[in-house]
């Protein structure tokens, strides 16, 4: 379900949001979901 939220933000927005979450890491679950979402888009 978290993947869907990330997929809604397409293009560079997804990269920016994913990178920001990975760098800041405010919420571990979202951080993992961000990485999974980015790999899902590219993979």
Swiss-Prot record:
Consequence of changing residue 12 to S: In vivo forms 2 thioether cross-links, no cyclopeptide formed
GO CC annotation terms, alphabetical: extracellular region
UniProt name for this protein: Subtilosin-A
Residue(s) of cross-link: Cyclopeptide (Asn-Gly): 9-43
Species of the source: Bacillus subtilis (strain 168)
Documented effect of changing residue 15 to S: In vivo forms 2 thioether cross-links, no cyclopeptide formed
Record localization: Secreted
Propiece residue ranges: 1-8
Induction, per UniProt: Transcription is highly induced by oxygen limitation and is under dual and independent control of Spo0A-AbrB and ResDE.
Protein's GO biological process: defense response to bacterium; killing of cells of another organism
Similarity comment: Belongs to the bacteriocin class V family.
Cross-link (2-cysteinyl-D-phenylalanine (Cys-Phe)): 12-39
Role of this protein: Has bacteriocidal activity against some Gram-positive bacteria such as Listeria, some species of Bacillus and E.faecium. A single mutation (Thr-14-Ile) confers hemolytic activity against rabbit and human blood.
Pfam families for the chain: Subtilosin_A
Post-translational modification: This sactipeptide undergoes unique processing steps that include proteolytic cleavage after Glu-8, and covalent linkage of the alpha-amino of Asn-9 with the carboxyl of Gly-43 to form a cyclopeptide. Thioether cross-links are formed between cysteines and the alpha-carbons of other amino acids, Cys-12 to Phe-39, Cys-15 to Thr-36, and Cys-21 to Phe-30. In forming these cross-links, Thr-36 and Phe-39 are converted to D-amino acids. Propeptide cleavage and cyclopeptide formation only occur after all 3 thioether cross-links are formed.
